[in-house]
């Protein structure tokens, strides 16, 4: 699920230079004019703009290497915080698929339809997470604070098959970017239902098994003050969880 996340600007001092695993050139590219224009777009809802300080949109766009003309799948996009940004950056020559799983479609389709009505380059796509297909190869598959949910039995997802389908859907050289709430070291996926967290190393190993190359991690929404012991919806930590952001690349 999607509680608000914590921004790079608030965390840099606490993290220190050792934690900055993204090259400086990637961080400076967050100032790309297209990213700034998307963030400043007057059509964005005010409640989404109010969350920018905590969701690091420019850093996320830069880390995901979003560019004009790309085709992007935003998996379970919710209200479309990132979908709107992607739509503005890829422009009329690109396309964004708002992928809504069949199991949650009744509740989530209306929100996706708001996005398709507002952006002609966005379309809603329904399907099973472990049977995803797209009409053209993708440049980017993006998943924010959702991966852990897909391990919960009620979602009925074969996560290994999901990752394999994402690998297949991407162009050679395409990216798979995942944001999620960090769990305590050594806990793997054991906290997915109790705390809504997943251990980053566990997720990384799962994705690599699908053939992806782990390329980089961004500290943009990290919070070292989070000890990983609380449910992400607990008021003591909600909106300030420690989150990892991993970038995987399909070889080619």
Question: Language-model segments: which ranges?
Answer:
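Class I SAM-dependent methyltransferase Rossmann-like catalytic core
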Residues: 35-63, 67
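Conserved class I S-adenosyl-L-methionine
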Residues: 68-78
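A short glycine-rich, Lys/Arg-flanked "PGG" loop and its adjoining helix->strand segment in the class I
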Residues: 87-88, 157-172
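A short acidic, Gly/Pro-enriched loop at the edge of an enzyme's catalytic core
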Residues: 119, 132-142
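A short SAM/SAH-binding and catalytic strip from SAM-dependent methyltransferases
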Residues: 139-160
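Conserved beta-strand signature within the Rossmann-like core of class I S-adenosyl-L-methionine
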Residues: 173-181
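Conserved Class I S-adenosyl-L-methionine
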Residues: 188-216
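Core SAM-dependent methyltransferase catalytic element
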Residues: 225-252
């Amino acid at each position: 699920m999607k509680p608000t996340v914590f921004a790079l600007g608030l965390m840099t001092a606490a993290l220190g230079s050792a934690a900055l695993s993204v090259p400086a050139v990637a961080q400076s590219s967050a100032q790309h004019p297209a990213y700034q224009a998307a963030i400043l777009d007057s059509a964005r809802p005010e409640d989404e703009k109010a969350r920018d300080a905590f969701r690091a949109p420019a850093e996320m766009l830069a880390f995901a290497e979003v560019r004009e003309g790309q085709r992007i799948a935003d998996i379970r996009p919710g209200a479309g915080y990132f979908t709107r940004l992607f739509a503005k950056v890829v422009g009329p020559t690109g396309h964004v698929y708002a992928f809504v799983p069949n199991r949650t479609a009744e509740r989530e389709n209306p929100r996706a339809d708001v996005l398709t009505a507002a952006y002609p380059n966005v379309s809603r796509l329904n399907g099973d997470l472990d049977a995803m297909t797209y009409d053209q190869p993708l440049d980017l598959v993006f998943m924010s604070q959702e991966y852990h949910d897909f391990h919960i039995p009620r979602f009925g997802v074969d996560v290994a098959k999901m990752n394999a389908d994402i690998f297949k859907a991407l162009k050679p050289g395409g990216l798979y970017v995942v944001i999620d709430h960090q769990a305590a070291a050594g806990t793997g996926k054991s906290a997915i239902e109790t705390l809504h967290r997943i251990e980053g190393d566990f997720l990384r190993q799962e994705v690599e098994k699908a053939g992806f190359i782990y390329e980089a991690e961004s500290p943009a929404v990290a919070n070292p003050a989070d000890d990983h012991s609380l449910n992400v919806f607990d008021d003591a930590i909600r909106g300030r969880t420690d989150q990892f952001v991993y970038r995987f690349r399909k070889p080619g």
